[in-house]
């Protein structure tokens, strides 16, 4: 966390652009796609530039790709995903994260491509999150999805105590920093 917190805004944006290029290539391999993302907290990988392209119709107009974009919201003790039509339809949660308003349409994740924030990954691609267990619980129930861990190079191969609920990523998008 300390290393991530010390990154400059320029380093975060450069790393984010690198990962967005990889997600862009993933999107272009599909005719339709459900993409579930997250809003960045602190120096997490920032996908807002990608979300703006999606919401502006870039992929539909230029590649005839239908995209449903969803973001998570914590509701009580669980996380749910909601369709996003505008980044203006978000509000700050008690955790300080921008989330969809409750008037948004819920998405039940199935065959979605899910971009997952994390603190680190172990050698088996299991995710160390922030301790709330929201992603682990959600994707423990909704297993028919592709999970993509978005990491800086220094977040790889971290040693941490793994429990039975820690989910493994299917794929990693990694950005080298420095």
Task: Enumerate the language-model features and the residues they cover.
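N-terminal active-site beta-alpha-beta segment that forms phosphate/nucleotide-binding
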Residues: 1-109
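Conserved phosphate- and dinucleotide-binding cores of soluble alpha/beta proteins
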Residues: 77-178
């Amino acid at each position: 966390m300390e290393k991530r917190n010390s990154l400059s805004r320029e380093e975060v944006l450069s790393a984010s652009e690198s990962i967005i290029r990889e997600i862009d290539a993933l999107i272009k391999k599909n005719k339709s796609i459900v993409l579930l993302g997250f809003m960045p907290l602190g120096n997490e990988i920032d996908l807002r530039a990608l979300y703006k392209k999606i919401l502006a119709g870039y992929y539909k107009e230029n590649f005839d790709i239908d995209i449903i974009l969803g973001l998570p919201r914590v509701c009580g003790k669980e996380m749910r995903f909601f369709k996003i039509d505008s980044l203006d339809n978000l509000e700050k949660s008690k955790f300080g994260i921008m989330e969809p308003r409750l008037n948004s349409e819920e998405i039940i994740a199935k065959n979605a491509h899910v971009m997952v924030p994390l603190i680190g990954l172990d050698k088996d691609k299991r995710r160390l999150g922030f301790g709330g267990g929201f992603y682990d619980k959600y994707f423990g129930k909704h297993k028919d999805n592709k999970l993509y861990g978005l990491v800086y190079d220094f977040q790889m191969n971290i040693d941490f105590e793994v429990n039975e609920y820690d989910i493994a990523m299917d794929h990693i998008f990694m950005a080298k920093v420095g």
